[in-house]
């Protein structure tokens, strides 16, 4: 099994994959979206097919009080669109997707802060830091889901 973690950002969508044993998440990159995360759907579908992803974990950016704001509603719309596009991709031979994976939204409060701390702890700063935050946030989101799945 392989899980995919997704952090929806305004400039980039960060991606992370699990190992087949579902113990560790690792970054696989970003997709530039230039303010429109819906532009990333086809590339995410390609990753799902190419990596034979069984489960997708999407960060749900709740407000600190636990309520859903504008960004959380956007993440929900994005996940619904991903699922619809995946169903269509399964029928379309030009995609390598053979089945629709489970899609899960998880609370991502403070994951960006955690990602920043992890990058600083790894002595990654300056220009290298900014583009890595989204994929590191995806790692935090996915690792949290992986750890929770073993409880």
Swiss-Prot record:
Which CDD domains does the entry mention?
YqgF
Q: List the disulfide bonds.
A: none
Q: List keywords of the entry alphabetically.
A: Cytoplasm, Hydrolase, Nuclease, Ribosome biogenesis
UniProt-listed InterPro entries = RNaseH-like_sf (IPR012337), YqgF (IPR005227), YqgF/RNaseH-like_dom (IPR006641), YqgF/RNaseH-like_dom_sf (IPR037027)
Q: Does the keyword Nuclease apply?
A: yes
Q: In the UniProt record, does the keyword Amino-acid biosynthesis occur?
A: no
EC no.? 3.1.-.-
Q: Which NCBIfam families match?
A: RNAse_H_YqgF
By sequence similarity, the record places it as follows:
Belongs to the YqgF nuclease family.
Name listed for the protein in its UniProt record:
Putative pre-16S rRNA nuclease
Lineage of source species: Bacteria, Bacillati, Actinomycetota, Actinomycetes, Bifidobacteriales
């Amino acid at each position: 099994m392989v899980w995919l973690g997704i952090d929806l950002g305004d400039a980039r969508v960060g991606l992370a994959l699990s190992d087949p044993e579902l113990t560790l998440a690792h970054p696989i990159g970003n997709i530039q979206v230039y303010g429109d995360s819906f532009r990333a759907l086809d590339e995410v579908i390609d990753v799902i097919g190419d990596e034979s992803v069984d489960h997708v974990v999407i960060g749900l950016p709740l407000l600190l009080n636990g309520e859903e704001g504008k960004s959380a509603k956007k993440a929900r719309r994005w996940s619904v669109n991903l699922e619809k596009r995946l169903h269509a991709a399964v029928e379309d031979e030009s995609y390598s997707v053979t089945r629709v994976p489970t899609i899960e939204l998880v609370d991502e409060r403070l994951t960006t802060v955690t990602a920043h701390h992890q990058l600083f702890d790894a002595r990654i700063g300056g220009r290298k830091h900014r583009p890595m935050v989204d994929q590191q946030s995806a790692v935090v989101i996915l690792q949290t889901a992986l750890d929770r799945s073993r409880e």
